[in-house]
C-alpha cells in the first residue's frame, strides 16, 4: 500500500502547544528590556494624538499584593489598547515615598530621630529604605508584563518633585486657600500626628454611654420659661455622651431651636429633655413615675447657664443645627476642642477651643487633679466615678458603636484641637468649584460621581500639616508674635524650592533663616511641620504631569485606582488641582473593586486565603493573571482563588490552541505572493474573515468602553464557537488534502492570515507575552513588535446583497448543529464510528432546501459527512429526526456507501477507479496528480 502522507499539507509550526509561560515569559522580558521596547513604542507613536493615564503612586513599602497586580494590569491593558487605537499613550509609573509607615520601619531598626541618629541622618535612612522598596516593587510590576518608563519613574522623594510639591503649596497660598487654626483634627496618639480623612477607618468599640445632669444656675428663670412654679428640687439640662473623657473640655450644651423641650419631674429633681425623647430616656434611666410639667421651644433656652458637674465653671445653652432626635436626650455635650461640629458652633458663639489633651493622649497638667497625666482611654471610668460622686450621673451602660481608628495602628483615635494648617473648603469657594468640576468628569462606574460629590459636600477643611520627620516641609516663615505668614511668603517658598531641587528636603532643615530673611530673621520662625503625604500624591498632576516632557503639557485623561480612592487620591488631587488651577486634574476616573477569595471573603493572612501574584506568575505565568483580571468585572469585588485561576488557564489554552492552529496552517504561506483576492476566495473563507470583522467591531467597542470582560467573552466566543466548532473544523479537509498551491487552499490560508493578524492584536493588551510570541511566528514582513502597530485594517465581509450572505451561513451553522446531534446519537447507538462514516439526507421545506441545494456537492464538506443529499420535507421517512431549532428540517442518517479513502478518509464509490492510484478516491487523485479539485463555496 502506498504512503500518501507526503502528499498532504499537514499543519506545521514552531509555535509550541504548551504555553510554559512561567519559564518562557522572563526570556521575553529580557528581550523587551534589551531592545528598549518602551522606547521603540514611544518613537513609533510620536506625533499621534495623546492619551495620558496618570499612575496613582503605590506606597513604597512592602511587596506587591494581588490588589496592586489588578491595578497595574488594568492600567497596562488601557495603555496598550490606546496605543493600538492610534494614540501616543506614555505611561510613567510612580511611587509615594514620604510618610509615617516608612518612618515606623526605620524607627524599628534605628530608633527614633534624635536617639542614635540626627533628624538629617534619619531622613537619609528613610530615603534609602524607600528606594529599596521601590526597586523590589518595580521588579514585580515589570514581571507582570506592564510596559512603562521603568528606568525613569516619578518618586515623590525625587528632589525636583519635592520642590514642585512646595511650589504647589505656594500656588494654593497665593490663591487664598490656606489658613491656620487651633482646630480639632483626627489625632492618633500612637502616630502622635494628625491624620487625613483617608487615614481613618471605622471599627466597633465598646464605650460607656452616660446621661449627665448639668444643674441650672438661675432656677427661677427656668421656671418662668416653662411657666411653672411647683418644681420639686433643682432643675438640670441632661446630656448624653459615649466619650466621658471629653467632659473636661465641655464649654456648652447644644440644643435645637425648633424642637420642643419638656421639663420633667422625677423624684426630687426636674430634668429638661427633648419632648420626643422623654419616654426612651425614662426607660433607659429606669424611671417609671414621672410628670411633664411644661414644654418650650429650644430657642427659648438659648444662653441660659448651667453648672459643669465637676470643673467648677458654668456653660451656656446654645443653638445648633447638628442636634438630632436619633438618640440621646436632645441636648448635646459640646467640646469645641474635641469635635468638628462642636468647633464650628463654638466659633459662632465665641467659645474657648479648650484642649486639655497632649499629643500622647494624656491629660495635660492642671486639667483636673485625678485626671492629670492619665491616658484619655483609661479616663472614662475616672470621669464616671467623678460624676457619680457629684450626683450628676443619671445612668451609665456599656454600648458598642462604630469608632474612628488609625488605619496603620488599628487603634482608636481622638479629635484634638492643635495649631494646624488647613486648606479651606469655603473661604475662597473651593468646595463649590470642586463640586462643579466633578460634573465635568466621566466617572466609571457612574456611581462614583455621587460618592465623591457627597464626600466633597460634607468634608471638613483639609488639615495638611503633620508633625513628622520624613516629609516635604511646608517651607513657611511665621512671625514670632503675630504668627502671621511672612509678607514675601511666595517669593521665599520659591527660593526654598530652588534649594530643594538641588539638595532635597534636607535643604529646608539645613537652612539658616538669615540666608533668606537677613535682619528680619530674628522676628520669624521656621514652621517645623511637614505636608500630609496625600498632598504629595495629590499634587502630582502639577509636580509630575505638568513638567514631564513626554506629557507635553497635556493634562491627564484618566486616573484609575481602587474604589477606596474616592476619599483618597481622587479627592486630594481634585482639591489641589481646583485650588491651584480652578479645574479637575482628570477627564475620566475609573475605579475597580477589591479582591476577595472564591467565597467572597476579604483577603486576610490570618484566614490564609491570600493569593500571591508572585506565586501565580511562578506557577502559571503572568498572562494567566492578566487574563483573570481582564475576564473579571472590575466594577464589583474581584474573586480570585486557585480554582478561578485554573478556569482562566483553561480559557487561555483555548485561545492559544486557536492561535496555534492558525499558525500551523499558514505554513508555506507568503502573503506577498500567495494572497487570494477577496472576490476569488471560497465563500466560506470570506464569511470567516467577516466573522473576524464583526468580532473586531465588538472587541474594539469593548476596549473603548473599558469593558475588558466583554473583550474576553467575545474573544472566547470567536475562538470556540465561530472558529473552533465550525470554520476550523470544516477547512481541515480542504487545507490538508487540496493541492498545496491551489486557489482552494490559498483562499483558506488567506482567510487564516487575515484572522491571525486581527487576533494577535486583540490579544496584545491582555495576553501581552503570548501575543508577542504569536507575532514572531506570523508570516510576512512586519515590525518587530505587535505593540507598535494599530488594529488590523485588512478585514472584509460578505455583502448583505449576496445570496450566501451572513444570514445564509448563520442558518447553515444551525443545520450543522442539528446534523451533529443526529450523528452523536448514531455514534452512541454504534451505527457509525466518526461523522465521515455517515451520509445524511436533509428533508427541508422549499426555502431552506434551495439554500442547501445551492452548495451542491460541497454541502457534505460543511456537514463533515461523506454524503449529503437534500430532499422535500414532505417525503421524510418516519425515522427522520425533526429539528427542534429549524421547524422546516428533518434529518435522516445512513452509513456512507463505498470504501474509505486512506488519504482523505471520506467514503466514496470511486476509490480505486484510477489504476495509477488504485487506493485513493477520484478527488484525491485530482489533488495528487491532476489539476486539483475546485471549491467555490466551502
Swiss-Prot record:
Documented EC number(s): 6.1.1.5
Position of sequence motif 'HIGH' region: 58-68
GO cellular component assignments: cytosol
Keywords of the record: Acetylation, Aminoacyl-tRNA synthetase, ATP-binding, Cytoplasm, Ligase, Metal-binding, Nucleotide-binding, Protein biosynthesis, Zinc
Broad class of enzyme this protein falls into: ligase
Modification sites for N6-acetyllysine: 183
Location of this chain's protein in the cell: Cytoplasm
Principal cellular location given in the protein's record: cytoplasm
Motif 'KMSKS' region positions after renumbering to this chain: 602-606
Cofactor(s) this protein requires: Zn(2+)
UniProt entry tagged with the keyword Acetylation: yes
Subunit structure: Monomer.
NCBIfam families in the cross-refs: ileS
Name of the protein: Isoleucine--tRNA ligase
Amino acid at each position: 500500500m502506498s504512503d500518501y502522507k507526503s502528499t498532504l499539507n499537514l499543519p506545521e509550526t514552531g509555535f509550541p502547544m504548551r504555553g510554559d509561560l512561567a519559564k518562557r515569559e522572563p526570556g521575553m522580558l529580557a528581550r523587551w528590556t534589551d531592545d528598549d521596547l518602551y522606547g521603540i513604542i514611544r518613537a513609533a507613536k510620536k506625533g499621534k494624538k495623546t492619551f495620558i493615564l496618570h499612575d496613582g503612586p503605590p506606597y513604597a513599602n512592602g511587596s506587591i499584593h494581588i490588589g496592586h497586580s489588578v491595578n497595574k494590569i488594568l492600567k497596562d491593558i488601557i495603555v496598550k489598547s490606546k496605543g493600538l487605537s492610534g494614540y501616543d499613550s506614555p505611561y510613567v509609573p510612580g511611587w509615594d515615598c514620604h510618610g509615617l509607615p516608612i518612618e515606623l520601619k526605620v524607627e524599628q531598626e534605628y530608633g527614633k530621630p534624635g536617639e542614635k541618629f540626627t533628624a538629617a541622618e534619619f531622613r537619609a535612612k528613610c530615603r534609602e529604605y524607600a528606594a529599596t522598596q521601590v526597586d523590589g516593587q518595580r521588579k514585580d510590576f515589570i514581571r507582570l508584563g506592564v510596559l512603562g518608563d521603568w528606568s525613569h519613574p516619578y518618586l515623590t522623594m525625587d528632589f525636583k518633585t519635592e520642590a514642585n510639591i512646595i511650589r504647589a503649596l505656594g500656588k494654593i497660598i497665593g490663591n487664598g486657600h490656606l489658613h491656620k487654626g487651633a482646630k480639632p483634627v483626627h489625632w492618633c496618639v500612637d502616630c502622635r500626628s494628625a491624620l487625613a480623612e483617608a487615614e481613618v477607618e471605622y471599627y466597633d468599640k465598646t464605650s460607656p454611654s452616660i446621661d449627665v445632669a448639668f444643674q441650672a444656675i438661675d432656677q427661677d428663670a427656668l421656671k418662668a420659661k416653662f411657666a411653672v412654679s411647683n418644681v420639686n428640687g433643682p432643675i438640670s439640662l441632661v446630656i448624653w455622651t459615649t466619650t466621658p473623657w471629653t467632659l473636661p473640655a465641655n464649654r456648652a450644651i447644644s440644643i435645637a431651636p425648633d424642637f420642643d423641650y419638656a421639663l420633667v419631674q422625677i423624684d426630687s429633681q426636674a430634668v429638661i429633655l427633648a419632648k420626643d425623647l422623654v419616654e426612651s430616656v425614662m426607660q433607659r434611666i429606669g424611671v417609671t413615675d414621672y410628670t411633664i410639667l411644661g414644654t418650650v421651644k429650644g430657642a427659648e433656652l438659648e444662653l441660659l447657664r448651667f453648672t459643669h458637674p465637676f470643673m467648677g465653671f458654668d456653660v451656656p445653652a446654645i443653638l445648633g443645627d447638628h442636634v438630632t432626635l436619633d438618640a440621646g436626650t436632645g441636648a448635646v455635650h459640646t467640646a469645641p476642642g474635641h469635635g468638628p461640629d462642636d468647633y464650628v458652633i463654638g466659633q459662632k458663639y465665641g467659645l474657648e477651643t479648650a484642649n486639655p489633651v497632649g499629643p500622647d493622649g494624656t491629660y495635660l497638667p492642671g486639667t483636673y487633679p485625678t485626671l492629670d497625666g492619665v491616658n484619655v482611654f483609661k479616663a472614662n471610668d475616672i470621669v464616671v466615678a467623678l460624676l457619680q460622686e457629684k450626683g450628676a450621673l443619671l445612668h451609665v451602660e456599656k454600648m458598642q458603636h462604630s469608632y474612628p481608628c488609625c488605619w496603620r495602628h488599628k487603634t482608636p483615635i481622638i479629635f484634638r484641637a492643635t495649631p494646624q494648617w488647613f486648606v479651606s473648603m469655603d473661604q475662597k469657594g473651593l468646595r463649590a468649584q470642586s463640586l462643579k468640576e466633578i460634573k465635568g468628569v466621566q466617572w466609571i462606574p457612574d456611581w462614583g460621581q455621587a460618592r465623591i460629590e457627597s464626600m466633597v459636600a460634607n468634608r471638613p477643611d483639609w488639615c495638611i500639616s503633620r508633625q513628622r520627620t520624613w516629609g516635604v516641609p511646608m517651607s513657611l516663615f511665621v512671625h514670632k508674635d503675630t504668627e502671621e505668614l511672612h509678607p514675601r511668603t511666595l517669593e521665599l517658598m520659591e527660593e526654598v524650592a530652588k534649594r530643594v531641587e538641588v539638595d532635597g528636603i534636607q535643604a529646608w532643615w539645613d537652612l539658616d533663616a538669615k540666608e533668606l530673611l537677613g535682619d528680619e530673621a530674628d522676628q520669624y520662625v521656621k514652621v517645623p511641620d511637614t505636608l500630609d503625604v496625600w498632598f504629595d500624591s495629590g499634587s502630582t498632576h502639577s509636580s509630575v504631569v505638568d513638567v514631564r516632557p513626554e506629557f507635553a503639557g497635556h493634562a491627564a485623561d484618566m486616573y484609575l485606582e481602587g474604589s477606596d480612592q474616592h476619599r483618597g487620591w481622587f479627592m486630594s488631587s481634585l482639591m489641589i488641582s481646583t485650588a491651584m488651577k480652578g479645574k479637575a486634574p482628570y477627564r475620566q476616573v475609573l475605579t475597580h473593586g477589591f479582591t476577595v477569595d472564591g467565597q467572597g471573603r476579604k483577603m486576610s493572612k490570618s484566614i490564609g486565603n491570600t493569593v500571591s501574584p508572585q506565586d501565580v506568575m511562578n506557577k502559571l505565568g503572568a498572562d494567566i493573571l492578566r487574563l483573570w483580571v481582564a475576564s473579571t468585572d472590575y466594577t464589583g469585588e474581584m474573586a480570585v482563588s486557585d480554582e478561578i485561576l485554573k478556569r482562566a488557564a483553561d480559557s487561555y489554552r483555548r485561545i492559544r490552541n486557536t492561535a496555534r492552529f492558525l499558525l500551523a496552517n499558514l505554513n508555506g504561506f507568503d502573503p506577498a505572493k500567495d494572497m487570494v483576492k477577496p472576490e476569488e476566495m471560497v465563500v466560506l473563507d470570506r464569511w470567516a474573515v467577516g466573522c473576524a470583522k464583526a468580532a473586531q467591531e465588538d472587541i474594539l467597542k469593548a476596549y473603548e468602553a473599558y469593558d475588558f470582560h466583554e473583550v474576553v467573552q467575545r474573544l472566547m466566543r470567536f475562538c470556540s464557537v465561530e472558529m473552533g466548532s465550525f470554520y476550523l473544523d470544516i477547512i481541515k479537509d480542504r487545507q490538508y488534502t487540496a493541492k498545496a498551491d491551489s486557489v482552494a487552499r490559498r483562499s483558506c490560508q488567506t482567510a487564516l492570515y487575515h484572522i491571525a493578524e486581527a487576533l494577535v492584536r486583540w490579544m496584545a493588551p491582555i495576553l501581552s507575552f503570548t501575543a508577542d510570541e504569536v507575532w514572531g511566528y506570523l508570516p510576512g514582513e512586519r515590525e518587530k513588535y505587535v505593540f507598535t502597530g494599530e488594529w488590523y485594517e485588512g478585514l472584509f465581509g460578505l455583502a448583505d446583497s449576496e445570496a450566501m450572505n451572513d444570514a445564509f451561513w448563520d442558518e447553515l451553522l444551525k443545520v450543522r448543529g442539528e446534523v451533529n446531534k443526529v450523528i452523536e446519537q448514531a455514534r452512541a447507538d454504534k451505527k457509525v464510528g466518526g461523522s465521515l462514516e455517515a451520509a445524511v439526507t436533509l428533508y427541508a421545506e422549499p426555502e431552506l432546501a434551495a439554500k442547501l441545494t445551492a452548495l451542491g456537492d460541497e454541502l457534505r464538506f460543511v456537514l463533515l459527512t461523506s454524503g449529503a443529499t437534500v430532499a422535500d420535507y414532505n417525503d421524510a421517512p418516519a425515522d427522520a429526526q425533526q429539528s427542534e431549532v429549524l421547524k422546516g428540517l428533518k434529518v435522516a442518517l445512513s452509513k456512507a456507501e463505498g470504501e474509505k479513502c486512506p488519504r482523505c478518509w471520506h467514503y466514496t464509490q470511486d476509490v480505486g477507479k484510477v489504476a495509477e492510484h488504485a487506493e485513493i478516491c477520484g478527488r484525491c487523485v485530482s489533488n495528487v496528480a491532476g489539476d486539483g479539485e475546485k471549491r467555490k463555496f466551502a
